[in-house]
Amino acid sequence: NQPVTGIHWWGMFGGWTESHLPPDLPVAFHIGIWTDGTRDSDVFDHPGSLIWETYSTNWVWAASGNEESDSKSEPGETCFLFSQLLSQDQWFQIDQARDGSGSTVYWLSIAALYDSERDEPEHVWTWKLRATASGAAGTSAQTILPAANGLSWPPTLGAQWKTGREIYDSWFNPLDMAFQL
């Protein structure tokens, strides 16, 4: 089992159609890896506990196309590829993460963090969604149970996914966030 040494993800900034980044960028991305919580639940596939995290502040980006626009007369939002290489002390070691369950399923979360001292950004970052290879839908997080003495947002190690919803397109096809490890 090879460690995770870097993460690549795709996303857009609401309403942004230029090939360069908008002025109201996140100060960081919170990246987390979660156990699989499905075996302990009778609801749809979903994360369990946060077992690894990092804050990405030195990511690199590239414009990687445009989303389709609802209007033929307007351009679609620009899609950006974000990349974060991890230093060796940040690598996610899969063998060390096993919790005795035998599960080989892990969940990735990436959230944009904005400066709380500034106005809400005009162009908020969102995930690029895509059809899933596995047929399982990605899951949003609506409620996270904080770890003891931890913050609820962003989550800290030991936090637990409590509620959320599966992500589908308008034809009820499962969607997942676009990423590569």
Locations of regions flagged by a protein language model:
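Aromatic- and Gly/Pro-enriched, solvent-exposed loop/edge beta-strand patches characteristic
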Residues: T17-I144
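PGST-rich, cysteine-poor low-complexity/disordered linker and tail segments that act as flexible spacers
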Residues: L129-L181
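A short beta-strand element within beta-rich, extracytoplasmic domains
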Residues: Q2-L21, L108
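Generic structural microfeature
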Residues: Q2-P3, P26, S103, P174
